[in-house]
Amino acid sequence: MMDTGCVWDGYFCDFDRNFAIHHASDAAMGAHQRLFDATEAALDILKPGISANDLFSAMDRILRPNQTAQMGSEEVGRYGHGLGIQLTEPPSLTTWDKTVIKAGMALTIEPSISYGDGLTMVAEENLLILDDGVVLLSERAPRDLPIIFVP
């Protein structure tokens, strides 16, 4: 995983990209695809008027089907946050943050998943909320985990 970002004219960006070197296990490929699908679930419902916790729930249903752990346990973290003149700003995409999403907000969608033997993978996209939807500010990560340096 590469977690990176930059500052432009006082505003932050923050995004992750995942890749495998030479080959990827089935578990890693599956985890990456679930992260992509969770991000899609959030993007499908994201518009002004939805709440931060609704976005969390949409992603959590994909990442942890049939699970009941709530935010605040060690098992579940947030799945994104606001972005702007600080790297991490409100709202937090959690079960407890009921902030209503408004046009003009910049957010990260940042689902994470544990897989295999203590491994974690995170995907992160930057986006801007418009009056009628959302525009991605980062180039969308592919659904299939990129493999680099193939022998």
What are these regions (language model features)?
Residues 1-151:
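Active-site neighborhoods and metal-handling regions in enzymes and metal-associated proteins
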